Amino acid sequence: MLFLNTTLDGLQMGFCFAVLALGVYISYSILDFPDLSVDGTFPLGGVVCTVVLFRLNLPPVLAVLLSFAAGALAGTVTGLLHVKLKITPLLSAIIVMTALLSVTLALTQLLTPGGYTTTIFSYRGHGMRSLFDLGLSGMAEKGATIGILFGMVLLFKLLIDLFLGTRMGYMLRAAGSNSRVVVSLGRDAGNYKILGLALANGFSAVSGAVYTQYTMSYDNTSGSGKVVLALASVIIGMSLFARLRFVRNTTAVAVGAVIYSLCLNYLVLVDTNGIYLKLLNAVLFALILVGNRQLSRLLGRLKAKRAEGGARA
């Protein structure tokens, strides 16, 4: 029973983080931009969602959309620092991530009667609604939650696929892989980079908002390690489905997020006190990187042998 509950919890967490992984897929894989500001936009989405639900009493779906807008704005700032002010990608992301630490902490003042800052805020006892208020309990609640989260991930995955299939999506991909193509068409590649970073951080904020509603609490430190989590998800998904051309990259990334979250949840069974959880997380990520490198070499050798065999024939 413990293993089943751990698996179901891992699936729920995986779907929460799948949207985050989709955003990082845009910034890292498509734009080739090391966007560390994800560690800041994830909690930004959570605190904006919490403030909207607590202070404005707006519907949970609208709170998620407003969180997307806040994350997209932060991503736009990262893009402007890089494109317009010529700051390196890594430093641009670090600047925004650092600034967001203060922004998110300042927004928590709206959650307290005295206006003081807080790092943790619980939804319970405040009559706040969430996407998962279904009046269910036990396995029925877990199943319904997984269904809602799966539908959300599927929606965002399809939206990305549709967008990347448009002319603007083609320009976005070209801006990351070969900006000269964009320039040759009379367009500014920098503007498409800004757009891509806005989308990526918007998705990160959505993930933070959904995660906050799922856990029924906001934690100002929730963004810690989310870049590692998302990158691991992208690497796992892209590696596992590299040879299956019928599987879209967005699908692979989402599945990678679920697999990685399941692995993290199973690690909790090993370290019940949670003391070494971050260490185990780091070791797992290192193993994924090494495994991905070895898998790439193996596939390269197999491809070379096939080519050699075809040439002899």
Please identify what each model-predicted range represents.
Residues 1-20, 48, 55-62, 128-134, ...:
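Membrane-interfacial amphipathic/re-entrant helices at transmembrane-helix boundaries
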Residues 13, 90-91, 118, 145-149, ...:
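Loop-to-transmembrane alpha-helix initiation sites
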Residues 26, 51, 76, 80-85, ...:
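Membrane-interface helix caps of multi-pass small-molecule transporters
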Residues 58-98, 256, 260:
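Alpha-helical transmembrane segments within multi-pass membrane transporters and channels
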Residues 89, 93-96, 100-165, 195, ...:
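Transmembrane helix-bundle core of multi-pass membrane transporters
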Residues 142-219, 223:
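Helix-loop-helix "hairpin" substructures at the membrane interface of multi-pass membrane proteins
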Residues 177-184, 188-191, 263-313:
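Cytosolic-side transmembrane-helix boundaries in multi-pass membrane proteins
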Residues 204-279:
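Transmembrane alpha-helical segments in multi-pass inner-membrane proteins
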